[in-house]
């Protein structure tokens, strides 16, 4: 019997196993997960800690038992793959519960081990990272048992911003620090001013160019010389790929430890595939490699791999657009396309508009700031970013579709808006971007 082994059982691994079973009722499918829990909604973790998601069961989407019963897929949690022998088509697995190692064979191997949270190595019982359900349960238990009143959040990526927002809404007073002034790096830095405004409005303290030197009890010592007491520290300081077990195999890794894949999500070894946060691929709209560790790519990868294994070789991955979005209190920040740093690869022009999200006379109108970058040579859109209280997601999604179909900046004047006063304006902000681009 054909045996498919999957490494990792969260977004990428659980989804690809499920998609394969949908098309293939015969193959044996075994999934190894190094952690305790499978198929949890990791994007929900900050919202669960903020009591926005009101039940732990809503975060856990499946268990090994329910997965096997529904799909005839074996999931083995607390089983860490430690090495790959791609010559013999075997892997070595460490069973954390039994404290034993064993080898198992595969015909097809699919790698979705994800990433681990970077740690500041503070050696403190009040310091936590947030990456999985075990982290989440530990933080939730700590908050309840210690009646946490205040918290220090380190880092201004999505985890840092979302956990700060949710701790505040839970009634815990947060302070934010970051090691530089460069925050929320997927956004243009001047468009992040609303992050500072939202914290100022709520008297939330924040400091940039600040780092922790040590923690003694509840006393946090900073590089600036300040010493402040906190009940809880949550670190959101980036991630690293879980690729140590791959390094002694023939599977190619890039210089950061990620796995390059082709448009079928194959590695350089034909019967080994990879998906999720562990991979690098390419952008759809421009000729650049891309690492986009977000949920959409993992789910798209799962579908492509399943179709490939089922024999439909017409299905290929056309690339990322990098659409991303985050809520921070009353504001939404979103972008699509290359990162601000990657813009240096292009001869580009930029056009922006800052106007009411819907008709000015209709109540509740708020400002929406939209910025679009385009290639001067072919006038195709290469990046867009938006910030506002309403309508951000709609505009970024429209621009994502425009980029998917390689529309030029000038064609945005032809975008036909679904207009009524509560929703937009007769000349939407996307139309205005197109009109303004005529002068560029």
From Swiss-Prot:
Pfam families (UniProt xref): Pyr_redox_2 (PF07992), Pyr_redox_dim (PF02852)
Keyword hit for Ribonucleoprotein: no
GO MF entries: CoA-disulfide reductase (NADPH) activity; flavin adenine dinucleotide binding; NADP binding; protein disulfide isomerase activity
Cofactor note: Binds 1 FAD per subunit.
Keywords, comma-separated and alphabetical: FAD, Flavoprotein, NADP, Oxidoreductase, Redox-active center
Catalytic activity: NADP(+) + 2 CoA = CoA-disulfide + NADPH + H(+)
Catalytic residues, chain numbering: 43 (nucleophile), 43 (redox-active)
Top-level lineage group: Bacteria
Disulfide bonds: none
Positions annotated to bind NADP(+): 151-166
EC number of the protein: 1.8.1.14
Residues annotated for substrate binding in this entry: 15, 19, 22, 39, 42, 71, 299, 427
Binding-site positions, FAD: 8-33, 267-277, 419
Cofactor requirements of the protein: FAD
Top class in the EC scheme: oxidoreductase
Summary of subunit composition and partner proteins: Homodimer.
Comment block on domains: Contains 2 FAD binding domains and a single NADPH binding domain.
Family: Belongs to the class-III pyridine nucleotide-disulfide oxidoreductase family.
Purpose: Catalyzes specifically the NADPH-dependent reduction of coenzyme A disulfide.
Stated name of the protein: Coenzyme A disulfide reductase
Organism field: Staphylococcus saprophyticus subsp. saprophyticus (strain ATCC 15305 / DSM 20229 / NCIMB 8711 / NCTC 7292 / S-41)
């Amino acid at each position: 019997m054909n045996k498919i082994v999957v490494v990792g059982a969260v977004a990428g691994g659980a989804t690809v196993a499920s998609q394969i079973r949908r098309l293939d009722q015969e193959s044996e499918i075994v999934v190894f997960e190094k952690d305790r829990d499978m198929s949890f909604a990791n994007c929900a973790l900050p919202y669960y800690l903020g009591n926005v998601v009101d039940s732990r069961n809503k975060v856990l989407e499946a268990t090994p038992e329910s997965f096997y019963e529904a799909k005839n897929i074996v999931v083995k949690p607390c089983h860490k793959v430690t090495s790959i022998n791609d010559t013999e088509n075997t892997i070595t697995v460490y069973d954390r519960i039994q404290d034993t190692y064993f080898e198992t064979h595969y015909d097809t191997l699919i790698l979705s081990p994800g990433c681990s949270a970077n740690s500041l190595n503070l050696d403190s019982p009040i310091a936590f990272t947030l990456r999985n359900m075990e982290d989440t349960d530990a933080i939730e238990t700590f908050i309840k048992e210690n009646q946490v009143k205040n918290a220090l959040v380190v880092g201004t990526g999505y985890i840092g911003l979302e956990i700060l927002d949710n701790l505040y809404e839970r009634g815990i007073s947060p302070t934010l620090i970051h090691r530089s002034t460069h925050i929320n790096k997927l956004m243009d830095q001047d468009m992040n001013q609303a992050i500072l405004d939202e914290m100022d409005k709520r008297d939330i303290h924040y400091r940039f160019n600040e780092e922790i030197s040590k923690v003694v009890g509840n006393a946090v010592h900073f590089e600036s010389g300040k010493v402040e007491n906190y009940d809880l520290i949550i670190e959101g300081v980036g991630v690293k790929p879980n690729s140590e077990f791959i390094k002694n195999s023939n599977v190619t890794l890039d210089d950061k430890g990620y796995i390059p894949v082709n448009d079928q999500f194959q590695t350089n070894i034909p019967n080994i595939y990879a998906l999720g946060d562990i991979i690098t691929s390419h952008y759809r709209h421009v000729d650049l490699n891309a690492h986009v560790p977000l949920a959409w790519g993992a789910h798209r990868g799962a579908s492509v791999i399943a179709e490939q294994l089922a024999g439909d070789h017409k299905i290929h991955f056309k690339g990322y657009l990098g659409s991303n979005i985050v809520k921070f209190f009353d504001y939404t920040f979103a972008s699509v396309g290359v990162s601000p740093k990657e813009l240096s690869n292009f001869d580009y022009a930029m056009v922006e508009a800052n106007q009411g999200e819907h008709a000015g006379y209709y109540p509740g109108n708020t400002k929406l700031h939209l910025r679009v970058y385009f290639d001067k040579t072919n006038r195709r859109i290469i990046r867009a970013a938006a910030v506002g209280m309403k309508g951000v997601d709609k505009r970024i999604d429209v621009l994502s579709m425009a980029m998917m179909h390689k529309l030029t900046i000038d064609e945005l004047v032809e975008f036909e808006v679904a207009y009524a006063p509560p929703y937009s304006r007769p000349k939407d902000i996307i139309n205005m971007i197109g009109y303004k681009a005529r002068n560029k």
